[in-house]
């Protein structure tokens, strides 16, 4: 098949490109709360997800939105939310939870002027440091920063791939300008995309350790309904997932969780 046959030229708004890319990447759950200038992402997801068997939920607030996304991801589906400014601030605790419990998800932050309520309809790039340092405890978060509508599409797909491959939350930083900008984008055919899905556990149920330290920085996830029993917590935990403060157990676990991004930096660096 020729390259031209694999792509479709479309005039897309940046926020719409983000939504379409998420669906193309396999996202089947979206929970969000309307907030300018990201609301078009939620609107588009509300229309797209039912067509592919996905679920869209408008939650009561920003904290509930990220909580629902983490629950859906644990439940076995690729999940995303989008927000801006003060909403991104409210999501930080659960972003840290996702890092500690190794729950893959994608968070889109369409940046606007701040601080506080700031300027909802004006652009800003003021959330870069928050994306990096927003959560406590030396949390490391991947942040991708597209600079065009075409890159919004490609980097949203990349965000899902990195999230699933490394079992981490991934943030995509857009701003109001490119979020609302309309450009002609070469949208690749779905069959031409390289998509990465999480590793699923296939070990015997009675010996399964959900956070195993076995030389692989990314342990497989238990598939819901497959008989695996697992405990998910934001507390420091051992390989079995249960809370512990034993330094003999905590030290290697934290090295694996916090160090895996540095050890796999080649996947992230452009």
Annotated model-derived regions:
Residues 68, 154, 182-183:
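Short, solvent-exposed polar/charged micro-motifs at secondary-structure junctions
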């Amino acid at each position: 098949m020729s390259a031209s046959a694999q792509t479709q030229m479309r005039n897309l708004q940046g926020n719409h490109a983000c939504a379409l890319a998420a669906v193309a990447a396999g996202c089947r759950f979206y929970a969000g709360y309307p907030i300018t200038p990201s609301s078009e992402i939620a609107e588009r997801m509300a229309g797209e997800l039912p067509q592919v068997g996905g679920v869209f939920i408008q939650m009561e607030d920003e904290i509930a939105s990220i909580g629902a996304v983490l629950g859906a991801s644990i439940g076995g589906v690729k999940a995303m939310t989008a927000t801006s400014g003060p909403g991104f601030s409210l999501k930080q605790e659960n972003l840290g939870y996702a890092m500690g419990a190794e729950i893959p998800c994608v968070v889109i932050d369409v940046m606007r002027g701040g601080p506080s309520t700031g300027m909802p309809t004006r652009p800003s790039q003021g959330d870069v440091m928050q994306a990096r340092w927003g959560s406590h405890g030396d949390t490391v978060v991947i942040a991708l920063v597209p600079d065009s509508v075409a890159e919004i599409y490609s980097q949203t797909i990349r965000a899902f791939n990195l999230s699933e491959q490394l079992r981490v939350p991934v943030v995509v930083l857009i701003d109001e300008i490119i979020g609302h900008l309309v450009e002609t984008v070469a949208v690749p055919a779905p069959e031409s995309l390289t998509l990465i899905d999480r590793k699923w556990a296939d070990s015997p149920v009675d010996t399964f350790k959900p956070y195993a330290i076995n030389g692989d920085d990314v342990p497989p996830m238990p598939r819901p309904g497959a008989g695996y029993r697992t405990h998910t917590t934001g507390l420091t935990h051992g390989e079995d997932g249960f809370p512990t403060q034993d330094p003999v157990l905590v030290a290697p676990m934290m090295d694996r969780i916090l160090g895996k991004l540095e050890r796999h930096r080649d996947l992230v660096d452009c």
